[in-house]
Protein backbone atom coordinates (compact mmCIF):
# COMPACT_ATOMS: atom_id res chain seq x y z
CA UNK A 1 0.00 0.00 0.00
CA UNK A 2 2.76 2.48 0.89
CA UNK A 3 4.47 1.72 -2.44
CA UNK A 4 1.32 2.56 -4.38
CA UNK A 5 1.06 5.84 -2.48
CA UNK A 6 4.77 6.40 -3.08
CA UNK A 7 5.30 6.81 0.65
CA UNK A 8 8.96 5.91 1.05
CA UNK A 9 9.03 6.74 4.76
CA UNK A 10 6.29 4.24 5.56
CA UNK A 11 7.82 1.62 3.26
CA UNK A 12 11.20 2.11 4.93
CA UNK A 13 9.67 1.87 8.40
CA UNK A 14 7.79 -1.35 7.59
CA UNK A 15 10.75 -2.90 5.75
CA UNK A 16 13.11 -2.20 8.66
CA UNK A 17 10.83 -3.77 11.28
CA UNK A 18 12.27 -6.94 12.77
CA UNK A 19 9.02 -8.82 12.23
CA UNK A 20 8.91 -7.85 8.54
CA UNK A 21 12.50 -8.95 8.06
CA UNK A 22 11.78 -12.31 9.70
CA UNK A 23 8.55 -12.93 7.80
CA UNK A 24 9.48 -11.56 4.38
CA UNK A 25 13.24 -11.97 4.51
CA UNK A 26 16.09 -9.51 4.09
CA UNK A 27 15.98 -9.59 0.29
CA UNK A 28 12.28 -8.75 -0.05
CA UNK A 29 12.47 -5.96 2.53
CA UNK A 30 15.52 -4.43 0.85
CA UNK A 31 13.80 -4.74 -2.52
CA UNK A 32 10.74 -2.85 -1.21
CA UNK A 33 12.96 -0.04 0.06
CA UNK A 34 14.86 0.11 -3.22
CA UNK A 35 11.64 0.26 -5.23
CA UNK A 36 10.16 2.96 -2.95
CA UNK A 37 13.23 5.18 -3.30
CA UNK A 38 13.26 4.63 -7.05
CA UNK A 39 9.59 5.59 -7.40
CA UNK A 40 9.95 8.67 -5.20
CA UNK A 41 13.18 9.68 -6.97
CA UNK A 42 15.17 9.84 -3.72
CA UNK A 43 18.51 9.33 -5.45
CA UNK A 44 20.78 9.35 -2.38
CA UNK A 45 18.71 6.78 -0.51
CA UNK A 46 18.22 4.73 -3.67
CA UNK A 47 21.96 4.64 -4.34
CA UNK A 48 22.71 3.67 -0.74
CA UNK A 49 20.30 0.72 -0.81
CA UNK A 50 21.39 -0.27 -4.33
CA UNK A 51 25.05 -0.37 -3.28
CA UNK A 52 24.10 -2.37 -0.18
CA UNK A 53 22.15 -4.88 -2.26
CA UNK A 54 24.97 -5.19 -4.80
CA UNK A 55 27.46 -6.00 -2.04
CA UNK A 56 25.19 -8.20 0.09
CA UNK A 57 26.12 -11.87 0.13
CA UNK A 58 23.18 -12.93 2.31
CA UNK A 59 20.63 -13.26 -0.52
CA UNK A 60 20.09 -16.64 -2.13
CA UNK A 61 21.83 -16.83 -5.54
CA UNK A 62 18.58 -17.07 -7.54
CA UNK A 63 17.15 -13.96 -5.84
CA UNK A 64 20.39 -12.11 -6.41
CA UNK A 65 20.54 -12.93 -10.13
CA UNK A 66 16.88 -12.04 -10.58
CA UNK A 67 17.45 -8.68 -8.88
CA UNK A 68 20.59 -7.98 -10.93
CA UNK A 69 18.88 -8.96 -14.17
CA UNK A 70 15.74 -6.89 -13.59
CA UNK A 71 17.46 -3.71 -12.47
CA UNK A 72 20.31 -4.00 -15.00
CA UNK A 73 17.90 -4.17 -17.92
CA UNK A 74 15.71 -1.44 -16.42
CA UNK A 75 18.69 0.91 -16.43
CA UNK A 76 19.80 -0.18 -19.91
CA UNK A 77 16.36 0.72 -21.25
CA UNK A 78 16.48 4.08 -19.48
CA UNK A 79 20.02 4.71 -20.74
CA UNK A 80 21.36 5.11 -17.20
CA UNK A 81 25.03 4.20 -17.63
CA UNK A 82 25.97 4.96 -14.00
CA UNK A 83 23.65 2.38 -12.42
CA UNK A 84 24.12 -0.09 -15.28
CA UNK A 85 27.89 0.07 -14.66
CA UNK A 86 27.42 -0.67 -10.95
CA UNK A 87 25.15 -3.61 -11.65
CA UNK A 88 27.28 -4.99 -14.48
CA UNK A 89 30.22 -5.08 -12.07
CA UNK A 90 28.10 -7.20 -9.67
CA UNK A 91 26.95 -9.43 -12.55
CA UNK A 92 30.58 -10.13 -13.42
CA UNK A 93 31.16 -11.30 -9.84
CA UNK A 94 28.43 -13.97 -10.12
CA UNK A 95 30.69 -16.22 -12.16
CA UNK A 96 27.72 -17.21 -14.36
CA UNK A 97 29.37 -16.96 -17.78
CA UNK A 98 26.15 -16.99 -19.84
CA UNK A 99 24.64 -14.28 -17.64
CA UNK A 100 27.82 -12.20 -17.87
CA UNK A 101 28.08 -12.62 -21.64
CA UNK A 102 24.57 -11.59 -22.59
CA UNK A 103 24.67 -8.74 -20.05
CA UNK A 104 27.91 -7.35 -21.48
CA UNK A 105 26.58 -7.67 -25.02
CA UNK A 106 23.30 -5.98 -24.03
CA UNK A 107 25.27 -3.13 -22.49
CA UNK A 108 27.31 -2.76 -25.69
CA UNK A 109 24.18 -2.62 -27.85
CA UNK A 110 22.02 -0.40 -25.64
CA UNK A 111 24.52 2.08 -24.23
CA UNK A 112 27.39 2.01 -26.72
CA UNK A 113 25.02 1.63 -29.72
CA UNK A 114 27.14 -1.16 -31.20
CA UNK A 115 25.82 -2.94 -34.26
CA UNK A 116 28.65 -5.38 -34.92
CA UNK A 117 27.46 -8.19 -32.63
CA UNK A 118 24.70 -9.60 -34.86
CA UNK A 119 26.63 -12.63 -36.12
CA UNK A 120 27.90 -13.53 -32.65
CA UNK A 121 24.43 -13.21 -31.12
CA UNK A 122 22.80 -15.17 -33.94
CA UNK A 123 25.30 -17.99 -33.28
CA UNK A 124 24.21 -17.99 -29.63
CA UNK A 125 20.56 -18.11 -30.67
CA UNK A 126 21.14 -20.97 -33.10
CA UNK A 127 23.22 -22.94 -30.59
CA UNK A 128 20.32 -22.72 -28.12
CA UNK A 129 22.63 -21.22 -25.51
CA UNK A 130 19.80 -19.12 -24.04
CA UNK A 131 16.12 -19.60 -23.30
CA UNK A 132 13.30 -17.61 -21.70
CA UNK A 133 14.08 -14.03 -20.67
CA UNK A 134 17.74 -14.27 -21.70
CA UNK A 135 16.79 -15.48 -25.20
CA UNK A 136 14.29 -12.65 -25.46
CA UNK A 137 16.99 -10.15 -24.52
CA UNK A 138 19.41 -11.53 -27.13
CA UNK A 139 16.68 -11.41 -29.80
CA UNK A 140 15.81 -7.85 -28.73
CA UNK A 141 19.48 -6.84 -28.99
CA UNK A 142 19.75 -8.31 -32.50
CA UNK A 143 16.61 -6.35 -33.43
CA UNK A 144 18.13 -3.14 -32.03
CA UNK A 145 21.30 -3.66 -34.06
CA UNK A 146 19.32 -4.20 -37.26
CA UNK A 147 17.40 -1.04 -36.42
CA UNK A 148 20.65 0.92 -35.96
CA UNK A 149 21.72 -0.31 -39.40
CA UNK A 150 18.41 0.73 -40.99
CA UNK A 151 17.33 -2.87 -41.67
CA UNK A 152 13.73 -2.45 -40.51
CA UNK A 153 12.50 -5.76 -41.95
CA UNK A 154 14.94 -7.88 -39.90
CA UNK A 155 14.53 -5.62 -36.88
CA UNK A 156 10.77 -6.23 -36.96
CA UNK A 157 11.16 -10.01 -37.27
CA UNK A 158 13.60 -10.22 -34.37
CA UNK A 159 11.42 -7.94 -32.25
CA UNK A 160 8.43 -10.22 -32.84
CA UNK A 161 10.53 -13.22 -31.83
CA UNK A 162 11.73 -11.40 -28.71
CA UNK A 163 8.15 -10.68 -27.69
CA UNK A 164 7.34 -14.40 -27.79
CA UNK A 165 10.10 -15.05 -25.21
CA UNK A 166 9.14 -12.39 -22.68
CA UNK A 167 6.62 -12.67 -19.87
CA UNK A 168 3.90 -10.02 -20.35
CA UNK A 169 5.28 -8.09 -17.34
CA UNK A 170 8.95 -8.27 -18.38
CA UNK A 171 10.82 -4.94 -18.35
CA UNK A 172 11.24 -5.05 -22.13
CA UNK A 173 7.56 -5.55 -23.00
CA UNK A 174 6.57 -1.86 -23.10
CA UNK A 175 9.54 -1.14 -25.38
CA UNK A 176 8.79 -4.13 -27.62
CA UNK A 177 5.08 -3.31 -27.81
CA UNK A 178 5.80 0.34 -28.65
CA UNK A 179 8.26 -0.69 -31.37
CA UNK A 180 5.81 -3.17 -32.90
CA UNK A 181 2.92 -0.68 -32.82
CA UNK A 182 5.01 1.97 -34.57
CA UNK A 183 6.45 -0.47 -37.12
CA UNK A 184 3.10 -1.99 -37.99
CA UNK A 185 1.23 1.34 -38.17
Q: Where are each of the predicted segments found?
A:
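Structural signature of alpha-solenoid helical repeat scaffolds
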Residues: 21, 58-61, 130, 168-171
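Alpha-helical repeat scaffolds
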Residues: 9-18, 43-56, 80-95, 114-130, ...
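Structured, soluble extracytoplasmic/luminal domains of envelope-associated proteins
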Residues: 38-79
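Acidic, Ser/Thr-rich low-complexity segments on the non-lumenal side of membrane proteins
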Residues: 7-39
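"A position-specific structural signal for the A-helix of alpha-solenoid helical repeats
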Residues: 27-35, 66-74, 100-108, 134-144, ...
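Terminal, low-structured helical/coil segments at or just beyond the last alpha-helical repeat
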Residues: 154-159, 168-185
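Transmembrane-cytosolic junction motif
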Residues: 1-7
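Structural motif corresponding to the intra-repeat A-B loop/turn of tetratricopeptide repeats
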Residues: 5, 40, 74, 78, ...
Amino acid sequence: MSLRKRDSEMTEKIADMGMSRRLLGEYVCDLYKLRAYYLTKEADKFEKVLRHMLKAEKYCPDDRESFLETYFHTFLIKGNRKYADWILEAIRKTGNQKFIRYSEESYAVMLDKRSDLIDKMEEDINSKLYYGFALGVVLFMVAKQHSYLGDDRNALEYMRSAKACFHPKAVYMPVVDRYLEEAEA
